[in-house]
Every structure is written in structure tokens, then in C-alpha cells.
């Protein structure tokens, strides 16, 4: 088992996709006291038992590709880096399941399955870097979810080390867990690491389809996609994936020297199945898009966009930080939320491209992102007000942020209702009586001082960050590059 005590190395674990400025250490102790990298389940058990014996916080971590602070310490403690547990245990072709350690990336697993003629029904857009355990812990919905279901839907069994050091299996490897008590898989899917550490994952796999066809369509504006989207989800067509990006996203990409279309927005759909079924579904999509005034784009553009599906935040290559806001909203409210997002962006004097996916027949995931200098306190913390307002917009329209982490932990009652939130806290207290497993997340906003920040105070603070942003000068990040590109 590898252990890191060096200060510089520990600092690398004090942030995730959206780093906080060092000044936030006044509230949170984001630097771990130690980093350990176990190689197998027994080592995880040892870590947990030793941490419990000395009442030391434990923070499970995959690749840190989420942006809500779920894998970042708030009270120091031990970060358990699971990326060394990255082996495929078995690919069971007879039963069409795969069992792996949780630290393998989705891309590495997908490549191994592809070589044997299989594919993952669902995986994140961050597949090249995201780990199985991390994405399952956030309850991920991603590529393939529209047709095959989200992360939790494809999980058959999890091996989990509880905060007591006990190892449990949550499901049945070959059949769904539909009886014999509550489905324990779903107890841990989306739990954000507060109930235990996943050490083994068994998931369903599927034979590669006869055909995977990608088609792209454009509109003059993202809002104009709404009527077509409402037709598609009611049409009976089941694309594997539907993703969209607006004009500003492509302007930023071109400013970064990347190839990108000059359109108001682009919708890209992946279809899987037999050639005959794909032909039928493509025709349905063509008609739905045309009826709303959209235009079908070239096969070459569609294939280019599909190739780029795992690289949403190439803008970081321009040297900027990118703070993503991720929300889930009803399909019926798509145009309302797009307009609401633009109003937030305008009020906060920002520029924020809107990208996203259609998660299922009822749900859209919007992922507007904001360029910022993550090393400047005022600019970076003020941008958190953007995430707060975006989350509020989702709640107002029957949706929610994609997760809670540190920053939205005060919204648990909004998610689950007062009684539901109390039940989740009771489960946390029962499974983790000493409160050592990823403390300060989901059920509370913890601080370095050992007490939790009241929900109203955290929400008020994030709201005030947005108010600060409104009085700051208009953001100009990226404008120089875009202006140069337009000349």
C-alpha cells in the first residue's frame, strides 16, 4: 500500500474539478493529513479500522472529476485514493457481466470490453479520467443513459467496506435485486461516499450493436430545439444518447484552436441497434427536427462531435478554470430553464456556454460552465453564486442540481423533503456512528472547526457571492482569444 505524506503531494488532493482558492482554507481544512493508495479490499479494511480507532476522517476519492467538493476533505484526515485498484477481475461473457475494482477508468474498461465485442450501456462524458467507483458514488447519468439507464441501473453488485470495517455485498451478481428487502445497490449509488468505500463493482454489459450511427442537427438558437425535443421523447425512438451545445461553446472551442461548427446550437444523437431499426429512428428524428425548423448537418460533422463527446471542457487548455453548473430539469421546462440560465448569466455579468444531454424521456441535464481564474478569491468565490442561482432555478422548475457534495449539502431537505432528509441522516448515523466516512458532505456542510455550517448560512453565503459578482466589472475572460479568432 502506497502512502503519501509530502505536503506538495497532499496539496494535489485538496481540490477536484473546480478548485477553491487557498483562502477558503479559513473554513475548510482541504489539505489531507495523509494520502493512502490501497491495492485491494483487505488494505481498505485496515485503513478504515485504523482510522476509526483514532477517530480520523476518511475521504474516498476516485479521479476527482466532479465539481461539488465530494472528494475534497473539509476536516483534513485521510484521503483514500482508489485509483491503484484499477484491475478487471473477470469479464463473464456467458452471463454478460463484468467485475472490476473501482479505480479503473470507464474508458479503460470500455476499451477492454470493445476488444471482446461488448460495450458499457452507460458511461460518463469524462470517461477517459473518471473512475467507476467515483461516478457510481455520484449516481451518474451520462452517455447511454437515455436508452439503457443511469449508473445505478447497470450495477448488479457492489462490494463495500463500511465505516466499521465490515465488508458487505449489496446485490446479486447475475440477477436483479428486486426482493428480499430493500435494494442495497441503490443505498450506495449516489451516496457520495458518506456510507462506505466501494472496493468492487459488478455491472451489466451488452454485445456491440449491429450498427452505431451518429446524426447531428442545428438550430439558430438552443431554445428552438425545445419543440423537437418534446416530440422526440414522445415518438417511441430511443437514441442511445442525445447531447447539445450552444453557439458560445463552439466560439470558445475555435478560440482554443479547435475545430468547431459555426451554428447557433448543435444537437447530436447516437442510434444503436439493427440497421433497419436505426433507419426507422433516424427518420423519426429527421422529421421531428425538420418540423421545428432545424437543419440536418453532415455525417462528417456528426462523427466529429461523437469523437469529441468525452472532451467537454477543452477550454481549460486556454489556461482558464471552468466552473460547471450541472442541473437536472424536466423536458417540459427545457426552454424555460435555458432562458432562466441566460438571465442569471446576464445578471452576474458573465459569459457561460450551455451544453448538456437528455438523460431520459422526462429529464434534461444542463451543464452551463463559467470561465474563471480559480486562483483569485473574489472571482472564484463569486462564481459560486452562479452555481447557487442555477440550483435554485432548477428547484423552481421541478428539477435539482446533480448532487450535493459540500456546496449544496444545505439543500438535502429540498431534495428529499424534511422527513426524507431526516431518514437519510438517520441511515448515516446508523451505518457510520462515529461520523468518520467523508464527513461534512451531503447531510451537512462540515467545517475544519468540527461543527457544521447551518444550511441557511451556507445558502446565504453562496447567494451573497453572487451579489458580489453583480457589482464586479463584466467578465472578459476568453474575449481576447475570441476577438483574435474573429479577425
Where do the model's predicted regions map?
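N-terminal flexible segment immediately upstream of the FAD-binding catalytic core
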Residues: 1-49, 65-96, 249-257, 301-322, ...
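C-terminal substrate-recognition/cap domain of FAD-linked oxidoreductases
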Residues: 5-21, 207, 218, 224-389, ...
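Conserved short loop/turn motifs at secondary-structure junctions
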Residues: 35, 97, 216-218, 408-416
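Short, ordered loop/turn segments at secondary-structure junctions
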Residues: 62-65, 125, 247, 406
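FAD-binding subdomain of flavoenzyme oxidoreductases
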Residues: 87-243, 483-487
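Activity-critical C-terminal alpha-helical subdomain
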Residues: 408-487
Amino acid at each position: 500500500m502506497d502512502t503519501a505524506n509530502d505536503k506538495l503531494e497532499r496539496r494535489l488532493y485538496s481540490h477536484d474539478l473546480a478548485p477553491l482558492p487557498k483562502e477558503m482554507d479559513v473554513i475548510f481544512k482541504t489539505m489531507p493529513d495523509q494520502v493512502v493508495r490501497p491495492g485491494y479490499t483487505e488494505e481498505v479494511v485496515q485503513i478504515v479500522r485504523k482510522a476509526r480507532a483514532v477517530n480520523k476522517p476518511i475521504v474516498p476519492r476516485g479521479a476527482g472529476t466532479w465539481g461539488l467538493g465530494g472528494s475534497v476533505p473539509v476536516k483534513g484526515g485521510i484521503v483514500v485514493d482508489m485509483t491503484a485498484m484499477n484491475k478487471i477481475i473477470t469479464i463473464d461473457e456467458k452471463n454478460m457481466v463484468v467485475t472490476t475494482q473501482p479505480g479503473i477508468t470507464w474508458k479503460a474498461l470500455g476499451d477492454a470490453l470493445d476488444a471482446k465485442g461488448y460495450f458499457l450501456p452507460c458511461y460518463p462524458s469524462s470517461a477517459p479520467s473518471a473512475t467507476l467507483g467515483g461516478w457510481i458514488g455520484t449516481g451518474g447519468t451520462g452517455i447511454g443513459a437515455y436508452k439503457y439507464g443511469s449508473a445505478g441501473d447497470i450495477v448488479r453488485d457492489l462490494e463495500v467496506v463500511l465505516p466499521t470495517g465490515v465488508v458487505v455485498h449489496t446485490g446479486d451478481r447475475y440477477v436483479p435485486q428486486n426482493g428480499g428487502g430493500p435494494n442495497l445497490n441503490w443505498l450506495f449509488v449516489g451516496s457520495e461516499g458518506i456510507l462506505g468505500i466501494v472496493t468492487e463493482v459488478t455491472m451489466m454489459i451488452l454485445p456491440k450493436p449491429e450498427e452505431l450511427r451518429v446524426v447531428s442537427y442545428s438550430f439558430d438558437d438552443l431554445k428552438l430545439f425545445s419543440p423537437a425535443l418534446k416530440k422526440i421523447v414522445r415518438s417511441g425512438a430511443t437514441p442511445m444518447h442525445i447531447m447539445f451545445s450552444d453557439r458560445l461553446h463552439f466560439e470558445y472551442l475555435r478560440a482554443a484552436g479547435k475545430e468547431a461548427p459555426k451554428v447557433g446550437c448543435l444537437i447530436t444523437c447516437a442510434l444503436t441497434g439493427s440497421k433497419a431499426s436505426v433507419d426507422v429512428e433516424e427518420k423519426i428524428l429527421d422529421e421531428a427536427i425538420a418540423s421545428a425548423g432545424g437543419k440536418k448537418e453532415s455525417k462528417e460533422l456528426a462523427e466529429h462531435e461523437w469523437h469529441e463527446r468525452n472532451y467537454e471542457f477543452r477550454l481549460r487548455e486556454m489556461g482558464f478554470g471552468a466552473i460547471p453548473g450541472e442541473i437536472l430539469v424536466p423536458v417540459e421546462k427545457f426552454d424555460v430553464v435555458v432562458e432562466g440560465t441566460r438571465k442569471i448569466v446576464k445578471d452576474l455579468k458573465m459569459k457561460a456556454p450551455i451544453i448538456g444531454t437528455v438523460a431520459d424521456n422526462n429529464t434534461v441535464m444542463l451543464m452551463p460552465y463559467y470561465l474563471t481564474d480559480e486562483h483569485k478569491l473574489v472571482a472564484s468565490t463569486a462564481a459560486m453564486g452562479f452555481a447557487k442561482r442555477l440550483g435554485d432555478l432548477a428547484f423552481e422548475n421541478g428539477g435539482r442540481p446533480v448532487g450535493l457534495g459540500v456546496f449544496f449539502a444545505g439543500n438535502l431537505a429540498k431534495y428529499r423533503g424534511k422527513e426524507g432528509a431526516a431518514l437519510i441522516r438517520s441511515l448515516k448515523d446508523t451505518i457510520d456512528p462515529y461520523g468518520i466516512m467523508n464527513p461534512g458532505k451531503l447531510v451537512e456542510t462540515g467545517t475544519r472547526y468540527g461543527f457544521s455550517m447551518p444550511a441557511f448560512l451556507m445558502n446565504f453565503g453562496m447567494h451573497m457571492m453572487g451579489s458580489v459578482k453583480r457589482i464586479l466589472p463584466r467578465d472578459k475572460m476568453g474575449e481576447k482569444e475570441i476577438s483574435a479568432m474573429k479577425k
